[in-house]
Amino acid sequence: MISFILCLALLIIGYFTYGKVVDNTFGPDDRETPAVSINDGVDYVVMPQWKLFLVQLLNIAGLGPIFGAMQGALWGPIVFLWITFGTIFAGGVHDYFSGMISERNSGSSVAEFTGKYLGGVMQNIMRVFSVVLLIMVGTVFAVGPAGLIVTLCKNGGLSGVLTTTLFWLILILVYYFIATFISIDKIIGKIYPVFGLCLIIMAVGVIIGIYTNPEFTIPEIWSHMYSMHPAGTPIWSFMFITVACGAISGFHSTQSPLMARCMKSEKQGHFVFYGAMVAEGIIALIWAAAGCALYEVTGGLNTGLAEILSGGQSAAIYLSLIHISEPTRLRRIS
């Protein structure tokens, strides 16, 4: 538990120290932002800072820092260090600069300002790269929540169409299209902050559940300085790939321009971009701690991972929450 608390403290300290160094390096000033100068009522709309933060957090987080961090805990508490230092020195820096460079270029997408600074060839490469990865990410962000809702419905005693993945996928895709064509402050600006807050509350609930439940123990880094991973999955490079979201995910650059178009002042960038990445790092740290504790309780790293992940991503998250809040219920379900 001490290792977890120290890493949590480092993330918070990193926001106020190194995050400020990054902010001063960029040099935000009092110039008009795109939200003020363009203000088209669709994509360029001034929104409150707290909304910008929560929308940005949900845009970059999602299932990534939950499921990835849980899998990353397979290597033991050493993953805490990767999440902590990756967030402070890489993830936060990347998110901040991608958002602020976009803001200085009229809120342009990453492909567009890449073309401005690196030329047309790199611009086209980035366009193709963005489209392909956005399709992949969009698929995961549709299938994952749909599966989680189906799991909740089934375990809640519901039946019929509500327990089919296709039904929820269609609803999610309909929402995708509506949110895409309607002004950003009408749906995304109203719904996303609520979901972002839920993401934070869920993470807080998880760590409280672990702390108050004597069945769980978060292992210390200094007690596990040996190789904890199973054969065939070395720390380098498997851990760094598995735990990308919550540490160093580069795909956040496609999301940062959305909020760059809605800032009233450049000075909000530190809180919105760097701060949201630190918040994601904290969420990932909590879920990694949950993974370490859960794997030990459910039979060690190898068998624990197999049990938690046996039903897929959605079932893994559901079972983890149930196991933390009510350990005996997991045994009844299985």
Question: Can you say where each PLM-predicted feature lies in the sequence?
Answer:
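Hydrophobic alpha-helical segments and their helix-loop junctions in multi-pass secondary transporters
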Residues: G138-G156, F167-W168, T180, L199-Y226
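Hydrophobic, membrane-embedded alpha-helices of multi-pass small-molecule transporters
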Residues: P48-G64, I207-E215, M225-A290, S325, ...
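Extracellular loop-to-transmembrane helix junctions
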Residues: I2-G19, G72-S102
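Residue-level detector of conserved catalytic or cofactor/ligand-binding positions
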Residues: S320-S334
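Transmembrane-helix boundary/entry motifs in multi-pass membrane transporters
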Residues: I38-K51, L57, E103-L134, S325
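Selective recognition of specific alpha-helical transmembrane segments in multi-pass small-molecule
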Residues: C7-T17, S130, L134-G138, G196-P214, ...
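Membrane-interface "cap" regions at the ends of multi-pass membrane proteins
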Residues: L10-I66, C262
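Transmembrane alpha-helical segments of multi-pass small-molecule transport proteins
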Residues: I5, M126-L133, C153-S183, L199-M202
